Regions:
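N-terminal secretory signal peptides and thylakoid transit peptides that target proteins
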Residues: 1-17
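C-terminal segment of N-terminal export signals and the immediately downstream linker at the start
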Residues: 23-62, 283, 290-300
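Iron-sulfur cluster-binding cysteine motifs and their immediate structural context
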Residues: 25-33, 55-76, 91-94, 118-144, ...
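Immediate flanking context of iron-sulfur cluster ligation sites
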Residues: 40-48, 104-110, 184-187
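Aromatic- and Gly/Pro-rich amphipathic surface segment
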Residues: 76-102
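Right-handed parallel beta-helix
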Residues: 101-120
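Short, conserved phosphate-binding/catalytic loop or strand-edge motifs used
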Residues: 169-173
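Long, compositionally biased charged/polar accessory segments in the mid-to-C-terminal portions
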Residues: 196-300
Length: 300
């Protein structure tokens, strides 16, 4: 009866493979996120006001229990000689650029997660470890993360950082918009400590109105562009500058949300986890055949 079982298995395996192929070949459409609150929060960064004190870096580390030196050491500007990116040790950094309008006063730019309205990191994550909250924040859940790092590839701003120093339980590190602080009615740590109010926290729609008003009143001071108002579908963090944003290492991005590409690829590959299931079924079948190939045929 072994041959009969083998025939049945082959028929079943063929059926599973065909079914899996037909299901996984159905085009998957990028999910539309839940409607965000019109009153969602944001931050306006005015790079013409920032003085590069880096107090925001210190406050961020303090708020997130990251190792840091005393605040008074951050006045050392020598670190600004190199361009840095947020990483596992610093969720926000400040970089310095030359100012074409005044060579004596550089342009300092704070860098962190932009908290996209339609985040590519969330769409690329196959286990739903990222959440876009109604108030605008994009957060990450360590309990769900499997360490695939697709979020790092998907992010148009190259922000998520991986804790390579932790071999067993690494985290994805990025700004969380001080989610726990703002839930309690507090300001984000970086906003609270800024001595010159270069970063302003408030309703995103109000911040956009403020930014447009500044541009209108001071056309010689600002370029006519609010970075983040429309880029990749809009971001919670917004920027004003006195020079082209490309000169400040801010990428040129279209207005279409980035998840349009990442979701169609990732969700197409992993839809229903059918391809992995089909693979496991096939491998199990091969093992069954090898185990039973030398058994004698049963005769009725």
């Amino acid at each position: 009866m072994a041959s009969q079982n083998r025939r049945n298995f082959l028929k079943t395996a063929a059926f599973i493979g065909a079914s899996a192929a037909s299901i996984s070949s159905v085009p998957t459409k990028a999910k539309t996120p839940d409607k965000l609150q019109e009153s969602r929060m944001g931050v306006l960064v005015d790079t013409t006001v920032c003085i590069g004190c880096r107090n925001c870096e210190w406050a961020c580390k303090e708020a997130h229990n990251l190792e840091t030196d005393p605040l008074n050491t951050y006045s050392n500007r020598s670190i600004l000689d190199i361009k840095r990116r947020p990483d596992e040790h610093a969720l926000t950094v400040v970089n310095e650029y030359s100012n074409p309008k005044n060579q004596l006063i550089p342009t300092d730019v704070k860098v962190q997660c932009m908290h996209c309205d339609d985040p590519a990191c969330a769409s690329a994550c196959i286990v739903g470890a990222f959440t876009k909250h109604e108030n605008g924040a994009v957060t990450w859940d360590s309990d769900k993360c499997i360490g695939c790092r697709y979020c790092m590839i998907a992010c148009p701003f190259q922000v998520p950082a991986f804790e390579y120093s932790k071999a067993l339980e690494p985290n994805i590190m990025k700004c969380d918009f001080c989610f726990d602080r703002t839930k309690e009615g507090k300001l984000p740590a970086c906003v609270e400590i800024c001595p010159v109010e270069a970063i302003t926290y408030g309703k995103r729609e109000d911040l956009i109105a403020i930014a447009h008003d500044r541009i209108k009143r001071h056309p010689d001071k600002y370029i006519n562009h609010i970075m983040g108002e429309h880029e990749v579908g809009g971001t919670s963090w917004l920027y004003l500058a006195g020079q082209d944003f490309t000169k400040l290492d801010i990428p040129v991005l279209g207005e279409d949300p980035a998840p349009g590409v990442t979701e169609s690829i990732q969700h197409g590959i992993f839809a229903y986890f059918i391809p992995p299931i089909a693979l496991y079924a096939l491998l199990g079948g091969v093992m069954w055949l090898n185990k039973n190939k030398n058994k004698p045929e049963e005769v009725f």
